[in-house]
Amino acid sequence: MVDPLSEAEKSKVTFASLGLSEPLLKAVEEQQYTRPYPIQRDAIPPILRGKDILGIAKTGSGKTASFVLPILELFHRTKTVGSRYASVLVLVPTRELASQVADVFQQLGVHLFPKVKTVAVYGGVSINPQMQAVHGADIIVATPGRLLDLLDQNALRLSDVEILVLDEADKMLALGFADEMNQLVDRLPKNRQTILFSATLGDAIDEINKSLLRTPVTIEVVEEATNLELIEQVAYNVDPTRKGPLLRYLIKTEQMQQVLVFASSTRTADNLVVKLTKNGIQAAAIHGQKGQQVRTDVLHKFKAGKLQVMVATDLLARGIDIQLLPYVINFDLPRSPKDYVHRIGRTGRAEATGKAISLITPDDEHHFKIIQKKMGKRVEQIDTTDLDLQGY
């Protein structure tokens, strides 16, 4: 385990005090990271010392930057870039996460010189461009299946890998990637640094820990409850036929420039986008029936602030991590109170305030009462019967 710090010591930790160089500190500031999350504070120093890591942390805890920053720092210190084969391999369970992790490497490494080349490889798209892209890559972020495909095509080799990151290892196992992970690990050099992150610590993860990690530093970040005090919550009681107009009314009257809208189905998501667009609101949907490239493009535009509204289903939204998101709207309520807190926790992060809005039909009333009870917080409900939605 890492040595515990006093609360006073924790409050004094900065990205500079963690040992990061000026180019990375500049990128951190540009990405509006104010101070290190607990997982970053505890993981960055031992990773820089070459230690193996067993990190127990959930999505949204800041774990991606906790390994991206020290890996980039090591490249900056050694200047060993541009080799024929990658020296860092990051394995992830999904295409969305592969794309996001690669984005974080690129965003935080923007000021490094020489440049560090990061490539994301995943299924669902043509393998041919990826076969070209991995040539000369310093960092490869990959889903296990596509990486094996590339190895079978002799597009790359893993003999130069010095750092292996297993991100969301529990999810990779849950998705049935155990055999692929074992095949890949067998092709890696034995003398390497291994960093494993998992949301949970079960028997399967414990087995991986024993077989892959060498005297690891164990970091367990107790899931910080979503800081509901930073999130302004409000609900609007509305007739089902008026939900669409009310959504458009709220986006326009509150002048929302970046809002994540949750819908219960792909059909609802697509219908919302059509009607939002007709009303002059820039919107796009992200869900399982969209192609991978479309989903990636939508997410990139939304994160960059070039898309006003992103409509998502729960399934596709789980891996989405967006800094300083000001608005979340539940067009449809989620099935469970836990999912509700997870959704609204997309805003109110990094000590920034946010607003979460829910549209409640008469059929939702009982369910919303249960959500409030489980959350331990009463949400103001506003009646919209007399609200003039003509023209929306």
Regions found by a protein language model. Give the residues of each.
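Conserved helicase RecA-like core
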Residues: 3-392
